[in-house]
Amino acid sequence: MTKKMSMQDIILNLQEYWAEQGANLMQAYDNEVGAGTQSPYTFLRANGPEPWNAAYVQPSRRPADGRYGHNPNRLFQHHQFQVVMKPSPENIQELYLGSLTRLGLKASEHDIRFVEDNWENPSMGAAGIGWEVWLDGMEVTQFTYFQQVGSIEVDSVTAEITYGLERLASYIQDVLSVYDLEWGNGVMYGDIFKEPEYEHSVYSFDQSDEKMLLENFDQYEAEAKRLTKLGLVHPAYDYILKLSHIFNLLDARGAVSVTERAGYMHRIRSMARAIAREFITARAKLGFPLLKDSKLREKYIGEKGIYTKKLAKKIKKEA
């Protein structure tokens, strides 16, 4: 057992720190996602004017990055620690540096750089200005201010901080391979994840059923559209996440051409936009219950509020 902070310790310290800063500790979302951003705790909640602070670990699946467990740093599944704060605090960068200090990484003792790297997720219609955070030459975090989510301009800027837990732990424990990381209590990362990594790589590159996946894509898209029309936001969003994962599996398998790839991404993006709009509408109908500021409530749902007008138009259109 190493005396250095285990991956489990890193997670516990980050959870404790961000809870102290007002974040709600959520659990990993129980669906296939390619990044913490795709969790509804980020993607959906970044829409609309309501404040929202959350932190959670999110296992993230990226089929094309699998390497059968042979590469020390490229993985089918890695873990992100996701923090979202909306509206973004003015001192968010200082808060982030404070989280590194909690992990024993003081800014005065390390070369910590914010390297401009504006971020975009084309298939989900999400984008923002941002930075990669480099710790002594290694990228450990992506820092983003959302400008658009679901192809919709945001009402309130969300700050997103995404820690790459394997990278951060590799630096802290000073190991070259993620499989040599201590997860916790003397149990190694490789003991838990190396076999699944190999098996998922075999499936993604060699054994996935292309015909079935293509059929599933069409079926899940149709179901997402049906559920969206019914106003069932969260079940519909689950199917959009499944669409995204199936597309990633098809892409890893080499089953889609460059032209087809753009078409599939457009279909996912269209659904993401539709569900983002439906989520905002649903929250507006509820009166944006998390929005407590009286001036902001007047701005968005007062007699002449932005969403009061939008809801009136929607009701008139549906009548």
Swiss-Prot record:
GO biological process, one term: glycyl-tRNA aminoacylation
Primary location group: cytoplasm
Compartments where found: Cytoplasm
PROSITE patterns, A to Z: AA_TRNA_LIGASE_II_GLYAB (PS50861)
Catalysed reactions listed for this entry: tRNA(Gly) + glycine + ATP = glycyl-tRNA(Gly) + AMP + diphosphate
A GO molecular-function annotation: transferase activity
Span of the signal peptide: none
Keyword Transferase: no
EC number per UniProt: 6.1.1.14
Keyword annotations of the record: Aminoacyl-tRNA synthetase, ATP-binding, Cytoplasm, Ligase, Nucleotide-binding, Protein biosynthesis
Quaternary structure, from the entry: Tetramer of two alpha and two beta subunits.
NCBIfam families: glyQ (TIGR00388), PRK09348.1 (NF006827)
Protein name per the record: Glycine--tRNA ligase alpha subunit
